Amino acid sequence: VASMLYLDYGKKEGEWLPNKFGGNKNLEAIEFFHHLNSVIRGTYPGFVTIAEESTAWPNVTSDIGGEGLGFSFKWNMGWMHDFCEYMKLDPLYRKGNHYAMTFAMSYNDSENYILPLSHDEVVHLKCSMVNKMPGYTADKYANLRVGYTYMFGHSGKKLLFMGQDFGQEREWSEERELDWYLLGEKLNQGVHTYVKELLELYRKYPAMYEIDNTWDGFEWMNADDAEHSTYCFVRKCSSSKNNLLFVLNMTPMKWEN
């Protein structure tokens, strides 16, 4: 989306012309998105449109009009970057980057977000999700499980690219299928079962999805325990008796109290 919204996107000085107001906004692209989203919503109720927008363009998911583009959801690219950078750190050194995992909540209410772990993160020598994780093989899978738990607890809808649900170990390539034989391996079976159980929890408890992208559905209990690399938060729903408490330890250490 960003490459359409900006006239100067990826271009050097002299390679683009400003709009009639002298700016770099592509007014025709904005009008196209207005028309696209209004037609889809009006013709096919229940359909969603999702924007991969990598800049700070505002109101991508706001109602159509002005700068509101009218998309249903926007990929939270910042969350994806921060999550991957944090999770690939050795757990004993994560405390130095503790707030990478809390930063996305500071702008969580600005859009209707999806938390994506997309194909972009598992190509071009970036490694598969499991091989981004530090440690020996078993440690990698343990880190992946706790990372997914954080993802499912965090505000925003979820997107896992194919193979991430069972710990695909090779990078993705459009030239071959996934390594399905891994479903016969114990560690991969464990991740597959774990993701299945996370999805079952997600369906069962409205607190995990009912109030996304506002502070009414999320409350930090402790976002500042960098020394122990722990996070504690509550996901809320309209029925407060069904709120969920998440406590995550991002190290292999045992902490008391």
Task: State each model region's role.
Residues K186-I211:
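Catalytic cores of secreted or luminal carbohydrate-active enzymes
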